[in-house]
């Protein structure tokens, strides 16, 4: 088990995307579940399924591809805040990823949200990652 489950999740999704896998398996924690639900709401993945027993719970994420060439919907994932260097932003400093084409995943007091939802609710928080 790794200490940084968010980085582990992003790396697994990135590698599965590059290898054009249909499904990727990530450890199920509260944070990875929340990030997976944000990815599902934003249309980056097709579905989420939780499998396994209590201690070994896993999330199965169905990745999304477009066209005949099976181009990945997720072009890149970038971890921003990490255990060694936390990055926080208040509501006025929330980042825009690629001028609004991508999303920033923010951990707020109201849960894990995208940058646009956090901005409309007037919330700041920890900037977890960028996805475009």
Curated annotation (Swiss-Prot):
Its annotated compartments are: Plastid, Chloroplast
Q: What protein does this entry describe?
A: Small ribosomal subunit protein uS8c
**Top-level taxonomic group:** Eukaryota
User: What UniProt keywords are attached to this protein's entry?
Assistant: Chloroplast, Plastid, Ribonucleoprotein, Ribosomal protein, RNA-binding, rRNA-binding
Q: What exactly does this protein do?
A: One of the primary rRNA binding proteins, it binds directly to 16S rRNA central domain where it helps coordinate assembly of the platform of the 30S subunit.
Where is it chiefly localized? plastid
- What Gene Ontology biological process does one annotation of this record name? translation
Family, similarity comment: Belongs to the universal ribosomal protein uS8 family.
Q: Kindly give the Pfam families that the UniProt entry links to this protein.
A: Ribosomal_S8 (PF00410)
SUBUNIT field: Part of the 30S ribosomal subunit.
> Which PROSITE patterns did the record assign?
RIBOSOMAL_S8
Q: Which GO terms describe its molecular function?
A: rRNA binding; structural constituent of ribosome
**SUPFAM superfamilies found in the cross-reference section:** Ribosomal protein S8
The record's InterPro entries line, in alphabetical order, gives:
Ribosomal_uS8, Ribosomal_uS8_CS, Ribosomal_uS8_sf
Question: Which GO cellular component term is one of those annotated?
Answer: chloroplast
């Amino acid at each position: 088990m790794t200490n940084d489950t968010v980085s582990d999740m992003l790396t697994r999704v990135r590698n599965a995307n590059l290898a054009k896998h249909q499904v990727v398996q990530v450890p199920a924690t509260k944070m990875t579940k929340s990030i997976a639900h944000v990815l599902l709401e934003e249309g980056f993945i097709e579905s989420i399924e939780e499998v396994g027993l209590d201690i070994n719970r896993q999330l199965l994420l169905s990745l999304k591809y477009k066209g005949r060439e099976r181009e990945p919907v997720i072009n890149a994932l970038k971890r921003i805040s990490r255990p060694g260097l936390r990055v926080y932003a208040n509501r006025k400093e929330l980042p825009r990823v690629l001028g609004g084409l991508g999303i920033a995943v923010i951990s707020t007091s109201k849960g894990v949200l995208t940058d646009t939802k956090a901005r409309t609710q007037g919330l700041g928080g920890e900037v977890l990652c960028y996805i475009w």
